[in-house]
A protein has these predicted regions:
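Conserved phosphate/anionic-ligand binding catalytic regions in large, soluble enzymes, centered on
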Residues: 9-28, 36-59, 128-138
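Short, small-residue-biased leader/transition segments that mark boundaries at the very start
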Residues: 1-3
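Alpha-helix capping and helix-loop boundary segments enriched in small/acidic/polar residues
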Residues: 5-6, 24-31, 45-49, 62-66, ...
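Short linear motifs at secondary-structure transitions and domain/linker junctions
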Residues: 19-21, 33, 111-115
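C-terminal amphipathic alpha-helical interaction region
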Residues: 74, 78-196
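Acidic/polar loop patches that form or flank catalytic/metal-binding clefts of enzymes
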Residues: 15, 19-28, 67-72, 80, ...
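Acidic, Mg2+-coordinating active-site segments of isoprenoid diphosphate-utilizing enzymes
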Residues: 32, 44-78, 144-147
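Alpha-helix initiation and N-capping motif
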Residues: 12-15, 30, 39, 51-55, ...
Length: 196
């Protein structure tokens, strides 16, 4: 679920950027970018919107600790495999740090814990986004390990994979921590909003 939501959010971001790249011309029907944007716009709404999915993820899925624990064991195994590849040491260190943050974040947001329910509810979107960025970093780490293992078989193809993975770690993944910081700030101002 968190991967699907991450892709739908990123799809919106990417098609929006594509319109911007084309300038006013991207807004016309000539290039098809506006159609891609319109087609993409529905994806965050499918299955009850990403925000509803975030609430469901936290209150139903994450509260079942076993699923989270099994996923973390799987991540640990891949981290061990990747730590044997010298070129991935920096990324292994980063994903290990984020794994610790994700564990703390999960304990904090767990409906079974001590965090007030309003704080949890106000933080579901941030948790889902953090989890999505983390999962994508895990997938990129695994992809990069496989790319290094097969580099000589198809150098150009795997170098592109490695470059894209490095880009993700350097330019996209740092967004994750902002969602953690936003979430743990609580819900005081979110819940004090008055709608007249």
């Amino acid at each position: 679920m968190c991967i699907r939501d991450s892709f739908t959010d990123m799809g919106m971001e990417i098609t929006n950027e594509a319109i911007q790249v084309f300038g006013g011309y991207g807004y016309t029907k000539d290039q098809g970018i506006e159609q891609l944007f319109r087609d993409n716009r529905i994806t965050p709404i499918y299955e009850g919107t990403n925000s509803v999915q975030a609430i469901d993820f936290v209150f139903r899925k994450i509260s079942q600790k076993k699923v989270f624990e099994n996923f973390m064991k799987y991540v640990d195994t891949e981290i061990q495999n990747c730590s044997k590849v010298d070129n991935l040491n920096e990324h292994v260190k980063k994903i290990s740090e984020l794994k610790n943050i994700l564990s703390d974040f999960t304990d904090w947001i767990s409906p079974n814990g001590n965090t007030p329910k309003d704080d949890i509810s106000a933080s579901c979107n941030d948790y889902l986004r953090f989890f999505g960025y983390f999962c994508l970093s895990f997938i990129w780490l695994k992809t990069m390990r496989k790319s290094y293992e097969n580099l000589e078989n198809n150098k150009e193809f795997y170098e592109d994979k490695l470059n894209t993975g490095n880009y993700y770690f350097d330019k996209i993944l740092p967004r994750a921590e902002s969602h953690y910081k936003s979430a743990i700030s609580g819900s005081k101002y979110t819940m004090s909003a008055k709608f007249n």
